[in-house]
Amino acid sequence: MAAADESSWPADVVEVAKVIDAWGVKGWFRVHPYAADAQAVFTSRRWYLQGPDNRPRPKDAPALPRLLHVTEVKEHGDGIVACAPEVADRSAAEALKGARIFVSRASFPTVGDGEYYWIDLIGLSVVNRDGESLGTVTDLIDTGPHSVLRLGYPSVDDKGAPVEGERLIPFVAAYIDSVQLDQKRIVADWGLDY
């Protein structure tokens, strides 16, 4: 049996950052993480790359590696820099500009009780204490003091045409009774008419 291609993407990849530009002359590159807490970027040593959306690569650009074996990641000023043996010099680092970085969800650090990664909440159904469906988590909003769940649910507009409604629920203990990841469900103290 042949060994699996090392650059094959795992089924659980999550986009966590993008390459901003080259840094220095030895192949280091600057990274912009999407989350304020970039632990997934710091802990994963296998970064899967995809070219930037809607931007053609120059014909003379070197091929974008599908997988980087990251050897070092560190904070630098208000950003993050990283290096990998697949990126030997500044020219190779410049070729990564705009690349999207994905890591395996399995490589994320474990969270404590009552803590969740947003990626694990997106797609969960939300019901209230009466079992009424409030919608499905489509996104979260960071308001500073706490996060807010953004739910989508089927609705109709003033002409009776089907549309997707939006409901916002603060993700705080006062309104969230339980998060049941195994059942893909959140129970909230929230009415349909709120």
Swiss-Prot record:
It is found in: Cytoplasm. Keywords: Chaperone, Cytoplasm, Ribosome biogenesis, rRNA processing. The keyword 4Fe-4S does not apply. GO terms for biological process: ribosomal small subunit biogenesis; rRNA processing. Its main location: cytoplasm. Residues 113-194 form the PRC barrel domain. It comes from the Bacteria. One of its GO terms (cellular component) is ribosome. Pfam families: PRC_RimM, RimM. InterPro entries: PRC_barrel-like_sf (IPR011033), PRC_RimM (IPR056792), RimM (IPR011961), RimM_N (IPR002676), RimM_N_sf (IPR036976), Transl_B-barrel_sf (IPR009000). Binds ribosomal protein uS19. HAMAP family: Ribosome_mat_RimM. Belongs to the RimM family. The PRC barrel domain binds ribosomal protein uS19. PANTHER family: RIBOSOME MATURATION FACTOR RIMM. This is Ribosome maturation factor RimM. It comes from Leptothrix cholodnii (strain ATCC 51168 / LMG 8142 / SP-6).
